[in-house]
Amino acid sequence: MSVFPYGLFIAAGVGCMLIAMLLTAPKRSFSKGTVTVFGLLAIPLSLVFSRLLYCVFQLNLFCDTYENPWLMLCIWDGGYSICGVIPALLLAAWLTAKMQRCSFRSLWDCVSLSSALLFAMLYAGEGRTELGIGKVIDAGFLTSAFPFLVLEQKLGVNVEYRLIVYRLQCLACVVLFLVMLLSRRKSKAEGILALRFWSIFASMQIFWESLRDDGHMLFIFLRIGQV
């Protein structure tokens, strides 16, 4: 059985998220067993929702290009959307709260904070998928000061520089995790931390996705990641 590099990043991201949940979970709100139940629900739900969202917006690919809609069931061939992870996490948190009889808002705060590490690893893994490359930029301060954020492409005698957007998104998620971690004590009411997190994350997505130039998950001219 083949092991895909991106799959290792997914596994690492899930591991980082669950460990972060165990370390940051409010002891009075829910137990460590609750984190285990959440993980058992979130993993399969994330795979299903990510695949489903990808297939919905890639129907032409399966119906017209491949001429075989049944290929949508071949999950081992790849084709997932990171955006599908968000509703999966929300549903998993709600189901876990019902099963464990704990506060959904408190659990969702913990899930939201820790999910930043999951998304960081998912974006880091895009380097293995040829996705997450940005538009052409001019050579200047950015290309010289931050060469690890720029991809150099040689076209004959010409050289083009493109932003490596997935690395920027990865770094942004790590920074967001640290900022939310330091500010969580200021969020006295349950659910406020999650509200802040997703508001900032959504704003980041709108900006970062606008820099991409990979043609992935486009609906006419709109990127699904921005929605």
What are these regions (language model features)?
Residues 1-227:
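A feature for loop-to-transmembrane-helix boundaries and adjacent hydrophobic helices
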